[in-house]
Curated annotation (Swiss-Prot):
It comes from Pseudoalteromonas translucida (strain TAC 125). The keyword Iron-sulfur does not apply. Disulfide bonds: none annotated. GO terms for biological process: mismatch repair. This is DNA mismatch repair protein MutS.
């Protein structure tokens, strides 16, 4: 519409109901408004058009504005959660406007107000959440010096973290790890292209990103004078982001947030850093197609509880370097295996369920009746769990038991207060157990026993009056009455008060019936009102226990992860890794944790040795021979050791790794206009610029996307730089057999190959890693296996012979190719003379300076 919908003169022209709608909508212009009208939530104007398109619902019209029909769409109130779930998944936010006034007493439109705002990052209703995935609200801020501050909150657990990073690469990796459901960024944020793929990205006003305001908000939330005790006081960029996030949560939730009790600063030096390419290539929790199948998480995650599943995924994405913490996890797994308790612990933990999110909903006052029974079941499951673990000598397990004590008073309260199987909603009552409150029992009994009382009264009045046809009736206009035929009207006692005269009957009321009427008509509504009051009172009783319950939930999630990894180790024949102070890697008969689960035939295990004498393995062998699998399994075994898991190997000694890099596979990045080769080179540059001697680097087929000599030269220079300049532990797979000569020239380089046996025109892949370089690539044999026509294979063989004969005469060796590469590099890079000439300002040179400069330039030639 061309006119200003929210202008005062426009609003005045509307009906009273539409005036009310527009005033409320003007406060929530950027999001959808669900406006409650009877049994429906209605949407109007552009909201109606958008909702009709997104939800595939009918669009109608109601009234006119500016001479045009007002678009309208609606959803039934009883099905609203389903529609909200769909909108949230699309990244939409919705303001829920409810009727808060009494229609019976309202003059004009019933009073309405927005009672909650549902956004992708702040939802708490279990119907809207993925139970085994974190649902994070994230806020980002970039300072003038380029530092990124990132704050993220899981409102369903109260975990509130901040981190600062200094590069686009680190920022992208962090956002990929968090996978936020909703992301807030400032109007001045320049690198929007780094976050534009996030459905729930929201631009916020610049004034919301203010350090002083952030510090005030956070201190107010935590009840502290400053933030020193949390260790975040110096992280100014992160605090600015956290302040915006906290204000947003307060605005959308509109209630206290008692379960958000602390803020934690992440330290990158404590973690094994994974960049975005590594997370993608290793398929940790998402496969290359965007699904969950055949990922590391799918193999490892058999947790009993959703909160345990979420914790396991967080650990997979945040491997740590702290040996004490890792050994604590590994020793706890060993203790569980020693007492053979995996199965029993799993069943006990299943009874505890997702208590983490239940506690958050209780804190947010959005819990439903069945959340109370879930908390009750969790508390009831603690006693048998303690019995199982009472004799545990492991310090971590003992600490878990200490952090999850039984709470008999709270358990007894919930057992008394809530029925065994309550309804989904409190709306219609039937949640509070009989015997919990005597007044509620009285109102319920009165409502349920009304018929019996009336039957007894009717019999008594018949006997008292002698009128056998006397009966008690009810209608909405006159309420309860005693009906007597006109023929018997003369028998009516004096205390009967006429209420209505009909053609053949008279209707009366007596004080006892009037008293009963008042009680019965009000008993159901009074029972429901009292039950809702008692239900809300339960929240207040639970509130003082929130902090203790959160500690309990975190401890039990940890136990679930440890028990799950113990079961995986037992079932899948994993070994306990030994964590070393050096940066060596020694794996005996390692296996790929995912591939071995999907293969029908037995997986061929292989060793890996990386140390000062074997810094880099140059891996050759045929396509389909297993080079990529061998490299990936090494990275996954190292990663699993750094999350505190047993590993798929006969044994493993894993050193202190600071980062894992992968350059495996590539595809065009069409959205950014980057070719496959450009993507490959960008990832290679990231590795060469960031790897250290403590890094594990996986390089697969560097240099494929350009000419043979260019590709070979780049592969040579990359391998040489990694080995000679960085000394990173590297697995370098290649089809450039010329690179195998590097092992003779560079200390610490070793050739290995994936074995294959050729018989006539066929090939058998042995998938065994052997020392030495491969003899050939078997490319034609693999092509034949793929179904390439025989005539094409034969022609390729003839061409291959010609090329091999020609190459033996003309092809330069590796040193010559390196020289060529260096010459090319020199041609690309400006010489010292060129740099000096570029810097000259002729207008500001004296004759003497010009003379001296000429001699200097000549000396540089």
């Amino acid at each position: 519409m061309s006119f200003d919908l929210y202008a005062p003169h426009t609003i005045k022209q509307q009906t009273p109901m539409m005036q009310q709608y527009l005033k409320i909508k003007s406060e929530h212009r950027d999001i959808l408004l669900f406006y409650r009208m009877g049994d429906f939530y209605e949407l109007f104007f552009d909201d109606a058009k958008r909702a009709a398109q997104l939800l595939d619902i009918s669009q109608t019209q109601r009234g006119k504005a500016g001479g045009d029909p007002i678009p309208m769409a609606g959803v039934p109130y009883h099905a609203v959660e389903n529609y909200l779930a769909r909108l949230v998944q699309m990244g939409e936010s919705v303001a829920i406007c409810e009727q808060v006034g009494d229609p019976a007493t309202s003059k004009g439109p019933v009073d309405r107000k927005v009672v909650r705002i549902v956004t992708p990052g702040t939802i708490s209703d279990e119907a809207l959440l993925q139970e085994r995935q974190d649902n994070l609200l994230t806020s980002v801020w970039q300072s003038k010096n380029g530092t990124y501050g990132i704050a993220y909150l899981d409102i369903n657990s109260g975990r509130f973290n901040v981190v600062e990073v200094n590069t686009d690469e680190a920022f992208t990796s962090t956002i990929q790890r968090l996978a936020p459901a909703e992301l807030l960024y400032s109007e001045s944020f320049e690198n929007v292209h780094l976050i534009e793929h996030i459905k729930g990205a929201r631009r916020r006003p610049e004034w919301e990103f203010d350090l002083d305001t952030a510090q005030h908000l956070l201190c107010e939330q935590f009840g502290t004078k400053d933030l020193v005790g949390f260790g975040v006081d110096k992280a100014h960029c992160a605090l600015v982001a956290a302040g915006c996030l906290m204000q947003y949560v307060k605005d959308t939730q509109r209630i206290a947030l008692p379960h958000i009790r602390a803020i934690t600063l992440e330290h990158n030096e404590h973690a094994v850093i994974l960049d975005a390419a590594t997370r993608k290539n290793l398929e940790l929790t998402v496969n290359l197609s965007g699904g969950f199948e055949n990922t590391l998480a799918q193999v490892l995650d058999k947790t009993a509880t959703p909160m345990g599943s979420r914790l396991l995924k967080r650990r997979i994405h945040t491997p740590v370097r702290n040996k004490d913490e890792l050994n604590s996890r590994l020793n706890a797994i060993s203790a569980i295996l020693d007492v053979q308790l995996c199965g029993e612990l799993h069943e006990s933990l299943r009874e505890i369920g997702d208590v983490e999110r239940v506690i958050a909903r209780l804190a947010l006052c959005t819990a439903r009746p069945r959340d109370l029974t879930r908390l009750r079941s969790a508390l009831q499951a603690l006693a048998p769990l303690h019995t199982l673990l009472n004799d545990a000598s492991d310090p971590r397990i003992a600490s878990i038991i200490k952090q999850s004590p039984e709470l008999p008073d709270l358990q007894a309260l919930l057992e008394r207060a809530v029925i065994e199987n309550p309804p989904v909603l409190i709306r219609d009552g039937g949640v509070i157990a009989p015997g919990y409150n005597s007044e509620l029992d009285e109102w319920r009994n009165l409502s349920k026993g009304a018929t019996d009382v009336l039957d007894q009264l009717e019999l008594r009045e018949r006997a008292r009056t002698g009128i056998s046809t006397l009966k008690i009736g009810y209608n909405r206009v006159h309420g309860f009455f005693i009906e007597v035929s006109r023929a018997n009207a003369h028998l009516v006692p004096a205390d009967y008060i006429r209420r209505q005269t009909l053609k053949n009957n008279e209707r009366y009321i007596i004080p006892e019936l009037k008293e009963h009427e008042d009680k019965v008509l009000g008993s159901q509504s009074k029972a429901l009102a009292l039950e809702k009051q008692l239900y809300e009172e339960l929240f207040r009783f639970i509130a003082p226990h929130i902090e203790q319950l959160q500690i309990m939930a975190a401890a039990l999630a940890d136990l679930d992860v440890l028990n799950n990894l113990a079961e995986r180790a037992l079932t899948l024949n994993y070994a306990k890794p030994i964590l070393c102070d050096n940066d060596n890697i020694s794996i005996k008969q390692g296996r790929h944790p995912v591939v071995e689960q999907v293969m029908k035939e037995p997986f061929i295990a292989n060793p890996v040795e990386l140390n000062a004498q074997r810094k880099m393995l140059i891996i050759t062998g045929p396509n389909m021979g297993g080079k990529s699998t061998y490299m990936r399994q090494t990275a996954l075994i190292v990663l699993m050791a750094h999350i505190g898991s047993y590993v798929p190997a006969d044994s493993a000694k894993i050193g202190n790794i600071d980062r894992i890099f992968t350059r495996i596979g590539a595809s065009d990045d069409l959205a950014s206009g980057r070719s496959t080769f450009m993507v490959e080179m960008t990832e290679t540059a990231t590795i060469l610029n960031n790897a250290t001697a403590q890094s594990l680097v996986l390089m697969d087929e560097i240099g494929r996307g350009t000419s043979t000599y260019d590709g070979l030269s780049l592969a040579y220079a990359t391998a040489d730089h990694l080995a000679s300049k960085i000394s990173a532990k590297t697995l370098f797979a290649t089809h450039y057999f010329e690179l195998t000569e590097l092992a003779e020239q560079t200390p610490g380089l070793v050739n290995v190959h994936l074995d294959a046996i050729e018989h006539n025109d066929t090939i058998a892949f042995m998938h065994t890693v052997l020392d030495g370089a491969a003899s050939k690539s078997f490319g034609l044999q693999v092509a034949a296996l793929a179904g390439v026509p025989r005539s094409v294979i034969n022609q390729a063989k003839q061409k291959l012979k010609l090329l091999e004969n020609h190459q033996s005469v003309t092809a330069p060796n590796i040193e010559q190719q390196a020289f060529t590469f260096n010459n090319q590099a020199q041609q690309i890079s400006p010489s010292e003379v060129e740099l000096q000439l570029t810097a000259i300002d002729p207008d500001n040179l004296s004759p003497r300076q010009a003379h001296d400069l000429l001699y200097k330039l000549k000396a540089l030639l």
